[in-house]
Amino acid sequence: MREEDEEPDELSLISKEGYGGILCIETGGPTPGLGCAGRGIITALEKLKETGAYETYKPDIVLYDVLGDVVCGGFSMPMRKGYADKVLIITSGENMAIHAGANIAMAVQNFRNRGYAALGGIILNRRNVKREEEKVQELAEDFETKVIGKLTHSDLVTDAEEQGKTLMECYPESEMATEYRILAEQILNLCREDGLC
């Protein structure tokens, strides 16, 4: 929305259909050093509702990719305002990533008794650091959840990104694409178990 002089009033101005019919909406945020990124998330969610995004596209599943810095209440807005049913934490075994993942899990726990989104599990996005699997498993156990998927670190992801495409589009027969398909099925199964999709 930052590219617009004024807030866009049409969904088509902030959305784009990508590979495989996936609808992508990039809302951006405030100018660096100015404004509140958490407020940007709130504004984005309100804009999706105002423009009728959910009614127009009737998505099977909605994924929000938000920063892991949940000390700001705005970053927890999708789960607090009923926009999310499950929270999946994507982390590597790097110490700062584990710390951010723990903060997200704590935020979900803090809201547990209010009927907000539940912690659905952890996804390991490998960076090939020492004790990576053990640290991520410990994180899952600390918050009484499970590791629902494990992704290999692959340069193919970066290669596809450099081409402005998804890995599935550039390398559909790769081992990484297979890992993504398996993870997608695991996420759908998690939703089906709770009658969410």
Language model feature labels by segment:
Residues A184-G195:
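Short, hydrophobic alpha-helical segments
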Residues C24, A160-E162:
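The feature captures the short pre-catalytic strand/loop hairpin that immediately precedes
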Residues Q163-S174:
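C-terminal boundary of histidine-terminating zinc-finger modules
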Residues E50-I61, V66-K150, D159:
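Conserved catalytic-core segment of NTP-binding enzymes
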Residues M1-V66, V70-V71, Y83-K86:
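Nucleotide-state-sensitive switch-loop elements of NTP-binding domains
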Residues T43-E50, N103, E138, I182, ...:
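Alpha-helical scaffold segments in soluble metabolic enzymes
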